[in-house]
């Protein structure tokens, strides 16, 4: 365990088992309802609160357990064994949901809002993608400084944004300096969703990930105080890319959890399926397939652990972003 953690090794191991039992038990049963409604029931959010899903990854000063990144991802591997839409929500909750504000928020905003993540008093979404501008320096949403009001005025649209049905704030990346080149054009903001001019726009259903709240967003003259800027002016792409680097490893770990469960199911099926008088697990061709599956799963787990070793030493280390990308690509 991380020496700064507030729980013991035994408590952590018990928590891993608790999470696995939770996602393979009631969460899998609830998914039948979610497949029809495309909405998470309130009992899902309450269960996450009761089982510390919104708390466990937070820094100690904000109600968390002080876990290392390796330990955080061990928890994620367990809940990734469950339904994909729920996994997506819990993956985001344990990473981008709070990490962007923690890493780049202004001190007074962090002090006000960071303690509210632990019990889902607040939740966020990450608004980068646009229909016509992709996810890079070619974005078209703008925030223009109004000298008279002393505020930024946000206009534009976002697309394919997750968790909009259960969040109160958006991390918005937009253009603040159109005359500059490349990434320097962009800045990031912590945007309250209850501001006048902030609109949620329905979009066609996305295949898979039922319940995870995908919509578009539209901003019409949304007024933002200067303290809502994340990082400095012109650092919008830095905010996005640094945050997404860690998120890439969470996606890789999601794939790891899914793969591990599928591997276990494959072994069980190979033992049960009998052809010509013997289980197919006795057949060499099936054993080779299973061995290759286990080899790839083990390699992915080792790749993720290697990233964690670097990240836990220095989360701004030279190879953190590179190794995060390797994890996601390999998965």
Task: Please give the residue ranges for each predicted region.
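Alpha-helical interface subdomain recognition
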Residues: 1-82, 92, 104-109, 116-120, ...
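Short glycine/proline-enriched turns and hinge-like loops at secondary-structure junctions
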Residues: 67, 135-138, 163-168, 182-185, ...
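Cytochrome P450 C-terminal beta-domain/meander region
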Residues: 134-155
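Flexible, small-/acidic-enriched active-site or ligand-binding loops
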Residues: 138-140, 144, 196-225
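A short core secondary-structure module
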Residues: 151-200
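Glycine-rich phosphate/pyrophosphate-binding beta-alpha loops
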Residues: 159-164, 209, 246-250
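A short, charged helix-loop
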Residues: 215-242
């Amino acid at each position: 365990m991380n020496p700064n953690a507030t729980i013991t090794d035994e408590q952590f191991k018990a928590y891993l088992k608790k999470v696995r039992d939770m996602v393979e038990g009631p969460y899998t049963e609830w998914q039948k309802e979610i497949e029809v409604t495309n909405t998470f029931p309130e009992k899902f959010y309450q269960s996450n609160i009761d089982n510390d899903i919104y708390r466990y990854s937070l820094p100690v000063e904000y109600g968390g357990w002080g876990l290392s990144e390796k330990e955080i991802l061990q928890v994620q591997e367990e809940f990734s064994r469950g339904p994909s839409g729920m996994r997506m929500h819990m993956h985001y909750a344990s990473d981008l949901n709070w990490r962007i504000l923690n890493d780049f928020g202004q001190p007074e905003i962090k002090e006000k809002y960071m303690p509210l993540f632990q019990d889902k008093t607040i939740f966020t979404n990450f608004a980068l993608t646009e229909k016509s501008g992709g996810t890079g320096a070619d974005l078209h949403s703008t925030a223009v400084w109004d000298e008279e009001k002393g505020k930024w005025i946000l206009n534009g649209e976002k697309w394919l944004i997750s968790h909009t049905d259960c969040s109160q704030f958006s991390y918005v990346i937009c253009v603040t300096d159109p005359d500059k080149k490349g990434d320097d054009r962009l800045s990031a903001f912590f945007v309250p969703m209850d501001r006048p001019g902030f609109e949620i726009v329905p979009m066609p259903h996305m295949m898979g990930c039922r319940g995870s709240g995908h919509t578009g967003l539209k901003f019409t003259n949304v007024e933002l105080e200067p303290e809502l800027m994340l990082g400095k002016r012109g650092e919008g792409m830095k905010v996005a890319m640094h945050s997404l680097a860690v998120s890439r490893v969470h996606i890789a770990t999601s794939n790891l959890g899914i793969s591990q469960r599928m591997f276990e199911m494959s072994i069980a099926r190979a033992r049960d399926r009998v052809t010509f008088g013997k289980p197919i697990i006795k057949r060499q061709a099936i054993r080779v397939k299973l061995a290759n599956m286990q080899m790839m799963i083990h390699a992915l787990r080792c790749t993720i652990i290697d990233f964690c070793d670097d990240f836990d030493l220095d989360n701004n280390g030279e190879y953190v972003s590179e190794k995060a990308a390797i994890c996601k690509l390999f998965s």
